[in-house]
From Swiss-Prot:
It comes from Gadus morhua. PROSITE patterns: ADH_ZINC (PS00059). Its cofactor is Zn(2+). PANTHER family: ALCOHOL DEHYDROGENASE, S-(HYDROXYMETHYL)GLUTATHIONE DEHYDROGENASE. Keywords: Acetylation, Cytoplasm, Metal-binding, NAD, Oxidoreductase, Zinc. CDD domains: alcohol_DH_class_III. Zn(2+) 2 binds at residues 98, 101, 104, 112. This is Alcohol dehydrogenase class-3 chain H. It is found in: Cytoplasm. The record marks 116 as: Important for FDH activity and activation by fatty acids. GO terms for molecular function: alcohol dehydrogenase (NAD+) activity; S-(hydroxymethyl)glutathione dehydrogenase (NAD+) activity; S-(hydroxymethyl)glutathione dehydrogenase (NADP+) activity; zinc ion binding. It catalyses: a primary alcohol + NAD(+) = an aldehyde + NADH + H(+); a secondary alcohol + NAD(+) = a ketone + NADH + H(+); S-(hydroxymethyl)glutathione + NADP(+) = S-formylglutathione + NADPH + H(+); S-(hydroxymethyl)glutathione + NAD(+) = S-formylglutathione + NADH + H(+). The lineage of its organism: Eukaryota, Metazoa, Chordata, Craniata, Vertebrata.
């Protein structure tokens, strides 16, 4: 009944950087050609949302509807959309997969570039927005904008998933879990019997630990300055945990000593350029690989001595865990449904959508792994 009409609904609007989100009634325009309008059922709160809200994101544009870790149901589709219909169960994707650009055709990357420019501007592929509030246009975020009861996404930024999947859980496969898990499996390609170190034990770090374990790593060292996170890390497969604050010398030196020369694989799940250096330098000479997952602030640069690389260490990074999104997310949902992949264990808090600012507070306080908001 709502197809083709503007929908008025609730959304959390970020009017400006550094201020709490404001619950507002917004207007969501119908989907145009190649677009899909979704009724969002659940959305996670991720550090990336807070990063943009803080003003550190070079692409951050305000006012905006944030959120990029959601799941919902298709409300209506725009002209020419064939892969989705009203009622489909879907997960929006901030890394699309058009299947046609040279990036999609190359097995070495998952970074589809079809709508990259407009997505970076906070707009739909035709360079306009579908959101208004109080007469003002609002920007989209990461091509998803899940902090709204209804959102509009490009049809290439959407995965069709099992309708039996609980959306208040699988929404997390839209970012954090898939990212950390894929970093271990796809980007590092962790080998059986290896030793790994994971820096930062939030949702992404725990997912990286889970990936290392699935890949057969025998020693997985969790590193965090908050020892309250060590119990959960052990549940996910960490064989030991290390608090850099317990040591006077740099953490990489401690790790190199603990592991007889360094780890085979390390993962930086924080977004701190100093820790990125520590993670690389904790790697074993000759073959150690470090994967950067965390997003650093605008203008920050990484540093190490070239000698670290000349002597056989590899520095790489990943976006969305290297998964080609449209084809991979439905499989990840299936793995979860078949109990091959943990998701429920990441959800520490489930709150009504109106409590979104409380969700951000829990995250900043280190009290939540993932907080899911339900509409």
């Amino acid at each position: 009944a709502t197809a083709g009409q503007v929908i008025k609904c609730k959304a959390a609007v970020a009017w400006e950087a550094g201020k709490p989100l404001s619950l507002e009634e917004v207007e969501v325009a119908p989907p145009r050609a190649g677009e899909v309008r979704i009724k969002v059922v659940a959305t996670g709160v991720c550090h990336t949302d807070a990063y943009t809200l803080s003003g550190s994101d070079p692409e951050g544009a305000f006012p905006v509807i944030l959120g990029h870790e959601g799941a919902g149901l298709v409300e209506s589709v725009g002209e020419g959309v064939t892969k989705f219909k009203a009622g489909d169960t879907v997960i929006p994707l901030y890394v699309p997969q058009c299947g046609e650009c040279k990036f999609c055709k190359n097995p070495k990357t998952n970074l589809c570039q079809k709508i990259r420019v407009t997505q970076g501007r906070g707009l739909m592929p035709d360079n306009t927005s579908r959101f208004t509030c109080k007469g003002k246009q609002l920007f989209h975020f990461m091509g998803t904008s899940t902090f709204s009861e209804y959102t509009v996404v490009a049809d290439i930024s959407l995965a069709n998933v099992d309708p039996k999947a609980p959306l208040d859980k699988v929404c997390l496969l839209g970012c954090g879990i898939s990212t950390g898990y894929g970093a271990a499996l796809n980007t590092a390609k962790v080998e059986p019997g290896s030793t790994c170190a994971v820096f930062g034990l939030g949702a992404v770090g725990l997912a990286a630990i889970m990936g290392c374990k699935v890949a057969g790593a025998t020693r997985i060292i969790g590193v965090d300055i908050n020892p309250e996170k060590f119990g959960k890390a052990a549940e996910f497969g960490a064989t030991e945990c290390l608090n850099p604050k317990d040591h006077a010398r740099p953490v990489q030196e401690v790790l190199v000593e603990m592991t007889d020369g360094g780890v085979d694989y390390s993962f930086e799940c924080i977004g701190n350029v100093e820790i990125m250096r520590s993670a690389l330098e904790a790697c074993h000479k000759g073959w150690g690989e470090s994967v950067i997952i965390g997003v650093a602030g605008a203008g920050q640069e990484i540093a190490t001595r070239p000698f670290q690389l000349v002597t056989g260490r590899v520095w790489k990074a990943t976006a969305f865990g290297g998964w080609k999104s449209v084809e991979s997310v439905p499989k990840l949902v299936e793995d979860y449904m078949n109990k091959k992949l943990k998701v429920d264990e990441f959800v520490t808090h489930t709150l009504p959508f109106d409590s979104i600012n409380e969700g951000f507070d829990l995250m900043h306080a280190g009290k939540s792994i993932r907080c899911v908001l339900t509409f």
